[in-house]
Amino acid sequence: MALLEIYQYPAAVLLKKALQVETIDDTVIKLVNDMGETMFEAPGVGLAAPQVGQSRRIIVYNPQAGSSNANEDTKEFKALINPEIIASSGSIVSENEACLSVPDYSCNVKRFETVTVRGLNLEGKKLEFDAQGLLAVIMQHEIDHLDGILYIDRISTLKRNMYKKKVRKGLTNH
């Protein structure tokens, strides 16, 4: 396994819809394993393929994130290929949502409390499950990445423009 570069806003790959995975082959499996290692090293609770420069509909996530079962020593992750949210309910505000591709910034984002997610596992088996709480937030956040949507696209225009101004200023200072 290898650590991958995490692309940061405003990288073009983050701003466009990722391509469906047609075949789960050794290249996809290697990418998933590298993404899992990169996610834990960052550290994060989820990572989408566009965040590592790959326009593919793949996410990895820590299923224990926010759980009382979470063990810092266990680097277990799960992968979803071509995931989609097929139902949602409830409404919560995720507190201090952050993103590895949007450094040094966190904010509240309105997210659904429960989502039903459908996708494939690495063996190509169809999965469908309900995610609640933090896992629901992770699913919405990572699947947004696959659609070219960053969490800063889901906040007020004022806050988003302030962040973009900060990024532009940082880019011109280098």
UniProtKB/Swiss-Prot annotation:
Name of the protein this chain belongs to: Peptide deformylase
EC number(s) from the headed UniProt entry: 3.5.1.88
Residues reported in the UniProt entry to bind Fe cation: 99, 141, 145
EC class (word): hydrolase
Annotated family: Belongs to the polypeptide deformylase family.
Reactions that this protein is recorded to catalyse: N-terminal N-formyl-L-methionyl-[peptide] + H2O = N-terminal L-methionyl-[peptide] + formate
Top-level division of the source organism's lineage: Bacteria
Described function: Removes the formyl group from the N-terminal Met of newly synthesized proteins. Requires at least a dipeptide for an efficient rate of reaction. N-terminal L-methionine is a prerequisite for activity but the enzyme has broad specificity at other positions.
Cystine crosslinks: none
One Pfam family cited in the UniProt record for this chain: Pep_deformylase
Species this protein is from: Desulforapulum autotrophicum (strain ATCC 43914 / DSM 3382 / VKM B-1955 / HRM2)
GO molecular function list: metal ion binding; peptide deformylase activity
Xref: InterPro entries: Peptide_deformylase, Peptide_deformylase_sf
